[in-house]
Amino acid sequence: MRERRDSTRRRFLAAAGAASTTALAGCSSILGGDGGDSSDRPTLADFRGSGEIVSDRPAPGGTSIEDLPDLEGELAVYLGGGEGGRYTTLIDLLNRYYDDFEASAQTQPSSQLANVIVDEHDSGTTQADVFWSVDAGSLAYVADNGATTALSGDTTSMVGDDRFVTEQWAGVAGRSRAVPYNTNQFSASDIPTSVDAIATEDRFAGTLGWAPTYGAFHGFVTAMRQLRGDDGTREWLNAMLDQNPARYDSEYATVSQGITNGEVGLGLTNHYYPILVFASNPDAPLDLAFTENDAGALVNTAGASVLDGAASPDLAELFVRHLLSAEAQEFLATRGFAFPMIDGVEPVGPLPTIDELSPPELDLQSLSDVQPTIELLEDVGILS
């Protein structure tokens, strides 16, 4: 599968440069129509991104919002992260779609909200109905502490891959770790298929960028701990330090500032940051590669769960089903460049499907074991 990815990555990023978040002109019913409805109800055009990257996309498959029961009532959502405001935009679209529905979101980092949820559950003061997290580890932590309720088969069956759903939470938007690189410094054939090579080969010394305070990086290191143990992970981290990597505040900055400006040649980030950079800078000397069968190829997921003690548990689960609707999945795929979680919606452009990636064999729920990762990063001197 690597040959296919190597031949399409540059074409994908070039197409991504034409993408934006403005709406497509056209349909007025949710998945198309003759324009006869003059209401303000959002259409597929409002959910979908625009530009060359989506111009040839067919209507999404899966379960349409029109085929789901109406959302009615008030809902409180604990929103972990929010992906630069995109998740709150999706909530706003659902609020606009239903006259008698109002979801409000309180946004904090997923790990912080997970601790808040468990504390509230233990004290019997649950304040929200839904936990929408950017990572499976936080979802698992909340579930492991008994703070969620089981989802019905109507909800869990909507997720097309068993790796990204449990009885307690459902994945809604997948993401992969990746290796963005500066094409003025490296070609596709220069990028190894292993993060070990990046940490040990002399040709990468002094040309690496990373964001070690970032939650996504902690998830990556946690995955490495699960795969090779603490000692093996410590060895890799020390090898990376020997490469003298440049430090950035976020993975977006690693790409937009470090790699794009040539401060560094490559980095370790989530797959969508290079695409977001291309959306505003289509001439950036930037491309994207994937490692294979190691923590650098980890595929994680944002997801949602219904909280134990929720004031509106039935409405909360119906909201989760709406996040898995054809329209919401199209939104997440074309605006956030995420990997869709339902059958019938494809990733944008020639971005590989999850099945075409080579992630390691790993239970995503093990990513909740983050505290030993923080302690390890502190011990080797990466965090203080």
Predicted regions and their residues:
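Conserved C-terminal helix/tail region of periplasmic/extracytoplasmic solute-binding proteins
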Residues: 363-384
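Extracytoplasmic/periplasmic substrate-binding proteins
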Residues: 232, 249-309, 346
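Early extracytoplasmic/lumenal segment of secretory-pathway proteins
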Residues: 51-134, 140
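Extracytoplasmic ligand-binding site segments that recognize negatively charged/polar headgroups
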Residues: 73-76, 80-88, 108-111, 126-263
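General small-molecule cofactor/ligand-binding pocket signal
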Residues: 103-108, 247-248, 287-289
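Haloarchaeal acidic low-complexity proteome signature biased toward cell-envelope/secretome components but also
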Residues: 1-64
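Mature extracytoplasmic/periplasmic domains
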Residues: 302-364
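Sec-exported extracytoplasmic/periplasmic mature domains
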Residues: 92-100, 118, 122, 136, ...
